[in-house]
Amino acid sequence: MKRMKNIRLGTLVACMCVLWGCEKPNVNIVMPQEASNRVLFAGEHLKKALEDAGYSSVMLSDTAGIDKDEVCIRLEQATDTAGLKKEGFTISTRGNMTTVTGNDGSGVIYGCRELIDHVGQYKDLKFPAQLTDAPEMVLRGGCVGIQKMEYLPGRGVYEYPYTPESFPWFYDKEQWIKYLDMLVENRMNSLYLWNGHPFASLVKLEE
């Protein structure tokens, strides 16, 4: 009986050690105190993605007080952008320190998206030792059609008022935020709203 208790106790201790070892580390996200809105946006999205993946995360303005064994992600913009492509970024990792250097604010966002995609795909923080990337196309975006598929009563071709009654989804702020976040996830930087021109109702031609 005593031996059985010892076995159970040993098993419990072993399980606790395994669970302790599997605990996900805290991730420090460091960015300049005077960071631009885009860098702040990048940091906030990275923080949320890490927390959704089970990591604890904190945003800091410097590395003071951070232990060398702690995971740290530094976000910064390049000071010398000569010869660098717009919206590009470089990711470099040395030990527990990963640095995302954007050629501009958008580059920092896309660099953070690269880290977010890595966490989602590989379920770890083993980021690339060195990675440089930049968009090939200047404009990348989605197109949203703002039109009806039928004539409105008493109106001609493409005649429809953009009111909450006619286009309720157009005034749904929460939905637009989700859509814009989707554009960011897909590295898009522009949004196109398309509508038909009511030419037929504006120009009257003789029979």
In which residue ranges do the predicted regions lie?
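A broad detector of short, well-ordered amphipathic alpha-helices
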Residues: L12, L40-F41, I109
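Generic recognition of cysteine residues
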Residues: C15-C17, C22, C72, C112, ...
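Acidic, contiguous N-terminal accessory segments
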Residues: R8, C22-G95, K126-A129
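Bacterial Sec-dependent N-terminal signal peptides
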Residues: M1-P25
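Feature activates predominantly on carbohydrate-active enzymes
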Residues: E34, H45, A49, T81-A82, ...
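A structural signal for alpha-helix termini and helix-coil/disorder junctions
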Residues: R3, D52, S56, H118-Q121
